[in-house]
Every structure is written in structure tokens, then in C-alpha cells.
């Protein structure tokens, strides 16, 4: 079957971009789907002359009581969406005489602007001559309303009834920096804020002025704190790599690793590498490389913090941020976290319940030392027994030989 016998579905909708080079047929004579605008047939096409569908009225059925209607052009005025009483009567009789079908009720729109049946807008000619057709040019009140017009309905009343509509509005261009209209601007130019140097203060609204000044002052203080922190951080040198941290080549390495119990300066990458070393014991890698003070965790920061109060705030913010992330060792109750109650991450079950912190378990060794551990496994005892040091046979032989000499000497001296 040739594709030329198949009607192009894009051409049927008026959007075929292939044109004459299309492999399908552009003949609408054999096409069953119609390109007539269904909204225009109902009388309220919002696109008007810009609609890509045909604005034509199809002829009525042969058995209908009304003759064929003329085909208006898209540029002509829209007809009234309400059928005449004769048409409505014939349609109702046709549906009521069909056996086996339920009677359909006509949908009634409650919004007058959608239906166009406002009683106060009905011209006298329509009341006097209910069967006649009114000219849309002579009666603009009877023109059908679009959906956009229905949305806009009541906005004027809403603006008029608002409490602040009578007050002049601030010019958005002057508030942003400069208004090219100057004194001829229809909007109100506000007073200049002494902090942000913008015309954003309403001269007649003290609440707006107070709120903006409070917000502006808070932003100004925050920016000043950042400026002071940057000034205090720009010459800090890492004690491990001996480089200025904020002058490193990579932007990801320009971060400080602040120890919780120490005030020495390190970059984040160096102190993390130090604490990940495997050849040292745990107390050594947790301590500061310079002063040997043990710190439980490292806080990443863009700026250097030396004040203890600011440092405490940074530690609390760091703990709160870590507490929102799920612990990868706990695994929602499926695993065991080796850090126990000291873990900064979130220990929660699948249903959202938080796990109670485990109490550290103690073990007393034969030497009298106490060690803490989180879990006890049978394999740990088996491995400890297998790796336990066994005395060598050479030591046993030497011990037995010494006992023999002592025995011989003791026997000779003890005889009577």
C-alpha cells in the first residue's frame, strides 16, 4: 500500500512541516476527521482569526427543521452561542424520541459571563423579538465571552474593594536602582534606605519601613561578619603542607579542617589524611599533630574560626547537620555502628523511630585492665585463642635441666 493513499495527520491539523515533500497525502477530500473548530461551532473560540482550524458552520441534517446556515469567514464577528428556540425544540424532540437512551440534560453554566445571559445586558430588541437574530455589531453586549474574559471577571471589583488599593504603589524601577521616567513616572518613588541605598521605603507605610530596615540591617551584619572572617582567614597557613589555605590552586582544597579541642590551623585534606593513617594507634591519629590534644571530630569550614563562642556555634551547627544524615553502619537497624552513642549520624529505623543510644559494654582482663567494646562475637574469642602465644620447647628443656641440677645438689646435702 502506498503512503500517498494515507492522509497526513499533521496536515489535517495544519502543522505539517514537510510541505510538498511529505510522503503522505495532503488531500482532505478522502480524510474523515474534520478540521472545523469545535469551539467556534459552540460560539466562543478564544483565538478568533488566529485559529488554525476552520471557522465554518457545517450544514444541518436533512431531517432537521432548520435550513443550512451560512458559512461565515474567520474574520467576521462571532455568532451568538445560544440556539434559537426552534432549534432547541427540535433537538430535544429528537433525543426524547430515541428508544433505549437516557435523556441528557443540558449543562447550565452558573457564571453569567460564560453563558452571556446576563439579564441586565439583554437589549430590548432581544426581549421583544425572541425568535429573531441580533446583529453582533449593533449589540456588543451579546458577544460570547472567552475563558480569559471569565477569569478577569471580578478583578476590578476585587481591586476596588481592597484596603490598600487606594495607596500609591512604589515604582519597581526606582526600587531596583533607576527609573528612566523620573518625575513623570505614574508610580510613587520611595525614600532612600541609608543601608542599601535604594528607594524602597514607602513614605506613607511605617510598617513597611520598619520591616525593610530590620531585614536590611540583618543582611548588613551578616555580610560584615563574612568580611571579617575572610580577612582573618586569608593569611592562615596549614601546619602540615605549609601552604596558605585560601591560595591553593584547587577550589575544593580551600577549606579549613577545624579540630574540636584544638586551635592549630590545618587544611581539611591534610588533617583528614592524617586521621586516616593505619600505621598508628587510635589515640595518636585522633590527636593534634602539634599539641597532641585529642579531638573527636574535624569540622570543615570555609573560614577560619578562632573565637571559642563562634567555634561552639560551628560545632553545634555541624552536629545538627550530621544528625540529619543516616548512619551507613547502622543501616536502619540492620547493622551495628562501631561508634555507638558517640556517632554523630542519625540512627533511625525504617518507620522513623530513633534508636536508643547503646550503653558501652566493659570487659575486665586478667591483668586488671578495663576495655570498652560495642559488640561481642564468638569468632573474636576463637581468633584470640588461635593467636595466643604458646611457650617454645627450648624454654621447657632449659627449665627441666635446671630443675635436675638443683635436685641433685639438694639430695647430696640433705643426706644424714
UniProtKB/Swiss-Prot annotation:
A zinc finger (C3H1-type) spans 2-29, 31-58, 165-192, 321-350. Highly expressed in the testis, and lower expression in the brain, thymus, heart, lung, liver, spleen, kidney, ovary, uterus, and seminal vesicle (at protein level). Expressed in primary immune cells, such as CD4-positive and CD8-positive T cells, CD19-positive B cells and CD11c-positive dendritic cells, and in embryonic fibroblasts (at protein level). Residues 95-123 have a biased composition (Basic and acidic residues). One of its GO terms (molecular function) is ubiquitin protein ligase activity. It is an enzyme of class 2 (transferase). Its EC number is 2.3.2.27. Pathway: Protein modification; protein ubiquitination. The keyword Zinc applies. It comes from the Eukaryota. Interacts with PDLIM2 (via LIM zinc-binding domain). Interacts with RELA. This is E3 ubiquitin-protein ligase makorin-2.
Amino acid at each position: 500500500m502506498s503512503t500517498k493513499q494515507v492522509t497526513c495527520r499533521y496536515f489535517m491539523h495544519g502543522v505539517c512541516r514537510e510541505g510538498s515533500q511529505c510522503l503522505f497525502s495532503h488531500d482532505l477530500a478522502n480524510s474523515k476527521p474534520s478540521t472545523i473548530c469545535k469551539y467556534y461551532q459552540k460560539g466562543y473560540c478564544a483565538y478568533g482569526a488566529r485559529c488554525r482550524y476552520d471557522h465554518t458552520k457545517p450544514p444541518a441534517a436533512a431531517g432537521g427543521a432548520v435550513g443550512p446556515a451560512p458559512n461565515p469567514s474567520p474574520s467576521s464577528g462571532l455568532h451568538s452561542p445560544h440556539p434559537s428556540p426552534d432549534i432547541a425544540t427540535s433537538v430535544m424532540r429528537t433525543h426524547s424520541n430515541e428508544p433505549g437512551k437516557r435523556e441528557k440534560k443540558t449543562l447550565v453554566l452558573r457564571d453569567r459571563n460564560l453563558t452571556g445571559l446576563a439579564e441586565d445586558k439583554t437589549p430590548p430588541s432581544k426581549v421583544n423579538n425572541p425568535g429573531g437574530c441580533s446583529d453582533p455589531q449593533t449589540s456588543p453586549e451579546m458577544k460570547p465571552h472567552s475563558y480569559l474574559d471569565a477569569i478577569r471577571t471580578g478583578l476590578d471589583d476585587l481591586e476596588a474593594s481592597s484596603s490598600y488599593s487606594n495607596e500609591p504603589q512604589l515604582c519597581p524601577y526606582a526600587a531596583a536602582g533607576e527609573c528612566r521616567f523620573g518625575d513623570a513616572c505614574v508610580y510613587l518613588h520611595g525614600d532612600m534606605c541609608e543601608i542599601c541605598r535604594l528607594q524602597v521605603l514607602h513614605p506613607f507605610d511605617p510598617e513597611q519601613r520598619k520591616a525593610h530596615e530590620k531585614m536590611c540591617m540583618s543582611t548588613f551584619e551578616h555580610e560584615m561578619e563574612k568580611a571579617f572572617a575572610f580577612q582573618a582567614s586569608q593569611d592562615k597557613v596549614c601546619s602540615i603542607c605549609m601552604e596558605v589555605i585560601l591560595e591553593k590552586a584547587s577550589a575544593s582544597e580551600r577549606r579549613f579542617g577545624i579540630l574540636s579541642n584544638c586551635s592549630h590551623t590545618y587544611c581539611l585534606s591534610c588533617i583528614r589524611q592524617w586521621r586516616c593513617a593505619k600505621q598508628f594507634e587510635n589515640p595518636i591519629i585522633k590527636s593534634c599533630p602539634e599539641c597532641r590534644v585529642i579531638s573527636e571530630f574535624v569540622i570543615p569550614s570555609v573560614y577560619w574560626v578562632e573565637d571559642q563562642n563562634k567555634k561552639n556555634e560551628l560545632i553545634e551547627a555541624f552536629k545538627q547537620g550530621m544528625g540529619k544524615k543516616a548512619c551507613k553502619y547502622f543501616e536502619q537497624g540492620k547493622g551495628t555502628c562501631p561508634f555507638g552513642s558517640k556517632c554523630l549520624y542519625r540512627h533511625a529505623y525504617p518507620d522513623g523511630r530513633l534508636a536508643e543510644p547503646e550503653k558501652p559494654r566493659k570487659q575486665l582482663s586478667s591483668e586488671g585492665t578495663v576495655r570498652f567494646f560495642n559488640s561481642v562475637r564468638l569468632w573474636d574469642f576463637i581468633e584470640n585463642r588461635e593467636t595466643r602465644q604458646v611457650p617454645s620447647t627450648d624454654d621447657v628443656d632449659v627449665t627441666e635441666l635446671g630443675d635436675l641440677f638443683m635436685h641433685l645438689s639438694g639430695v647430696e646435702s640433705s643426706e644424714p
